[in-house]
């Protein structure tokens, strides 16, 4: 997928890190870019920075708090009200090393990394379909390989571990499962979907991981530009146009965890629909 004419992308968490690098690269290619982030100040600063770096006037801000499904709905409504097509949604935003609950009472890492993005994608799916060919790109992680499954009860309480890395792994497994099930449901519509591992990137996602652990994690990390490479590959490469539902690492297909079964993907989808129903009507 190239951009000979202006195409439109929404990138969550594009105020910093991999998301900003992804948004800037697409803006340089002539895309119309929406920076969706929780902080208006940081988001608008990123918009200004991307505009300057890409010499583009087609970069805009959308307010989005993935920890509040009301905000997710408002974000989708704000975009849809503009009447524009949507060719790519990049589910990039994420948190790690945090404790707490979302506004709707879900474990915070799961709520931000999976459930908020699930709702956003559902609310934008009709627009993606009408703009096809279109893609949904979800930034997961190879951390999902360490998740042994989903403890459904744990999704309703704050993280119990010191680092939150167990909860992070489960949230990334959910990203992979979401992409798989969306691929099944969107088959034949012209909307394709991809999950990916960006590499271990020196980004703001690790800022809340406790000090004794953080320095060990951040050694030899990739730059944000290097980390954005696989997101850009999944968003634009013609090589993956027919490879919906696959998992990518270093711009190449990789087998996901054996825990990522179609049965678990369906169960997660159904539960996510139930949990988010009040915000989908």
Spans of features found by a protein language model:
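The beta1-alpha1 cofactor-binding region of Rossmann-like NAD(H)/NADP(H)-dependent oxidoreductases
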Residues: 40, 62-77, 103
